[in-house]
Amino acid sequence: MINGTALILGALVTLVGMPQFINYFRVRNEGQMIREEGPKWHQKKSGTPTMGGMVFIIAIIIASLVTGVIFHGAKVSLLMLLFVLVEFGLIGCWDDSIKLLKRQNEGFKAWQKLLGQIIGGLIFFLVIKETGVALQLNIPGLGIWHLGGWYALFVIFWLTGFSNAVNLSDGLDGLVAGLSTIAFGTYAIIAAHQQNIPVMIFCMAVVGSMLGFLVFNHKPAKIFMGDMGSLALGGALAAVSILLNQELSLILIGIVFVLETLSVILQVLSFKLTGHRIFKMSPIHHHFEMLGWSEWKVDIVFWIVGLIGSIITLISIL
């Protein structure tokens, strides 16, 4: 009942709000500028409405709070997840707004985005520390590592790293929305197993909102989530793993996000050290496009990889 309410509310609010938001951009003749360094055939997407993350963030907030208040009360953990979602979403919103105003694909400077992410991560840590969250990591094969105050650095790194990882992965229609549905759905199952109702409510609200968003974001996308959506989802995903004390599970559940990020790092290092590129283009989803794969094929294969990582995680935890 609780799961269904959060999921349905998230989907309904997104389905109702997104058409109006798309129409707003079309009337103003504004949209996403596509970077010239990407695949040439992506240029036809230029002008597609963006910042769809604004709608599904609102949908997640409404679905989470309504379901939380009705069934369980708005607990601190639920409010902190919403804080991370909104704070990281606002960073992306500012970034997207600059791009739209300048009509180019360059927004925030890297240090400005990083500063906002660090502040968000630090606030999240300070609050969860007071709620009694264990400041430790359960590392398979190595046991439990008690980090104490050093856990703050881990939290900041985790939220910042995964928000940027999801952001890097958002280069194909429907890719991140599908992967996020799988990842948050997996954490909803883990939260239910732990009887952590607030986190379960939040995760199901995200799943519902993502399913609603996919109606408009599948190829050919009628709207993009923008940095507002991808940064918010990545930060929230990391925060969920922390509140469930399953931080390192995100490496498998979010395996595609990890691989996308590693492909960029390896590409840059290889080119600087040897003058040669490992991939035809990075992030790695573009590499497969350059090999002749359609966007749908990349989406489906990457979704399957994400699903396999999630299934392995569930088998090991439950």
From Swiss-Prot:
**One Pfam family this sequence matches:** Glycos_transf_4
Q: Keyword Zinc, does the record have it?
A: no
Transmembrane region(s): 2-22, 51-71, 74-94, 114-134, 139-159, 172-192, 196-216, 223-243, 251-271, 298-318
Does Metal-binding count among this protein's keywords? yes
InterPro entries, A to Z: Glycosyl_transferase_4, PNAcMuramoyl-5peptid_Trfase, PNAcMuramoyl-5peptid_Trfase_CS
Which keywords appear in this protein's UniProt record, sorted alphabetically? Cell cycle, Cell division, Cell membrane, Cell shape, Cell wall biogenesis/degradation, Magnesium, Membrane, Metal-binding, Peptidoglycan synthesis, Transferase, Transmembrane, Transmembrane helix
What are the annotated GO cellular component locations?
plasma membrane
Pathway stated in the Swiss-Prot or TrEMBL entry: Cell wall biogenesis; peptidoglycan biosynthesis
Enzyme group, top EC level? Answer: transferase
Annotated Gene Ontology MF terms? metal ion binding; phospho-N-acetylmuramoyl-pentapeptide-transferase activity
Q: List the EC numbers from the record.
A: 2.7.8.13
Q: How does it sit in the membrane?
A: Multi-pass membrane protein
Which chemical reaction does it catalyze? Answer: UDP-N-acetyl-alpha-D-muramoyl-L-alanyl-gamma-D-glutamyl-L-lysyl-D-alanyl-D-alanine + di-trans,octa-cis-undecaprenyl phosphate = Mur2Ac(oyl-L-Ala-gamma-D-Glu-L-Lys-D-Ala-D-Ala)-di-trans,octa-cis-undecaprenyl diphosphate + UMP
Q: Which CDD domains match?
A: GT_MraY (cd06852)
Q: Name one GO biological process term.
A: cell wall organization
By sequence similarity, the record places it as follows: Belongs to the glycosyltransferase 4 family. MraY subfamily.
Task: Give the function comment from the record.
Answer: Catalyzes the initial step of the lipid cycle reactions in the biosynthesis of the cell wall peptidoglycan: transfers peptidoglycan precursor phospho-MurNAc-pentapeptide from UDP-MurNAc-pentapeptide onto the lipid carrier undecaprenyl phosphate, yielding undecaprenyl-pyrophosphoryl-MurNAc-pentapeptide, known as lipid I.
Q: What is this protein called?
A: Phospho-N-acetylmuramoyl-pentapeptide-transferase
What is the organism of origin for this protein?
A: Pediococcus pentosaceus (strain ATCC 25745 / CCUG 21536 / LMG 10740 / 183-1w)
